[in-house]
């Protein structure tokens, strides 16, 4: 259709030009051929860009006594039902969770899931507009607030230029044909024909440049999302087109406290002291909190967001001594950060207890400090491990540690805290995306390559998942001088 419109317009324009100036047929043919070639070569398919989350949201939540994985299925730019999956793990209590999808000025939608045996439970809510939303997961005692985005259908400026250009060219084509047939003066027909070619040039140029134009900064990833900037992210580009924009943000400060079986974490902006409420989901969680007890037991928990900058998790500090911890977070504009803190045990009379038995076997080929070592963990004999937090395995490394009764106190000042991963291997023919915890086909061996920075004794823990149970295998590794 576009080629026909171009040919007709060119013939109309060229006929008028020939009548007025006496151009040769060869010149007319070359002129027509040039425009047809430009039209055929320079018109790729131009589609609208969807701004927002392009994938499902997977986030771990240590809610009450449960270790949950909440999956918010992608919705938008075409609005529809909001599908939510909740994975409960072995050891989690049965019960009912109330789910609420909320956004200021939007219709609130509610639902619930009834948890039973370990597995996946689903609910369907509704969202009625694009913008930033919160999914509230309430167990009756604590309400976890998970931020997510509903993307909008966004038309980029070059797509608008292309659409308007083609529309104007079509309208001017009709005017040009009518003027050619009815005008008594040849130059009058030349005006709409020339305008049509200009409009067509704008349209073809916009369509040609569309695949090569960079997307605008992403709301929710580069800067704080609002209803306005999700609907029109290009407005921010236009208003800041004079100079480059610095989206960086300062580090975060962490203050931790414990009491009444609850561990509280407050995050504040180091430049302003205000609550830091711009965390991104990083490796399947808003916060990865690693806690080492006085006896050397490691806990990997994911505090839930209860208010801006405030996070909580159920945690009993039953040992006397120091509970050392690090919080691994990713801040919008601030990158990945590792924050340290500690709390004291709440039972002065209680002494450190023995660590729980290992649920796997670890062997290591240890190289001198600074060189790559190989750590292998084996969990059972069957290849049925499940991905947890998007990974087959997690390895926590703390050290070097001196000898002493309070391991938590030594861990607090240890120079090395590391969190390594064993990635999910790509599946042949897979279309992409993160496999959920229903996929049980990995292992039983998990291998890590890690370089210990300093010589000394390290505590190492490897974690994975099988049959919806989180398994942990601890070991000590001695690293020699290079």
Predicted ranges, named:
Residues 49-119, 375-377:
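Membrane-proximal low-complexity regions enriched in glycine and acidic/polar residues
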Residues 80-90, 260-274, 327, 371-383:
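Beta-strand-rich structural segments
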Residues 115, 125-129, 305, 312-318, ...:
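Residue-level recognition of secondary-structure-to-loop junctions
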Residues 124-151:
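Extended, hydrophilic extramembrane loops/domains of integral membrane proteins
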Residues 171-184:
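Alpha-helical transmembrane segments
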Residues 187-214:
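Internal/C-terminal transmembrane anchor helices
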Residues 210-282, 319:
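Membrane-interface segments at or immediately adjacent to transmembrane helices
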Residues 305-352:
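Hydrophobic, ordered structural segments
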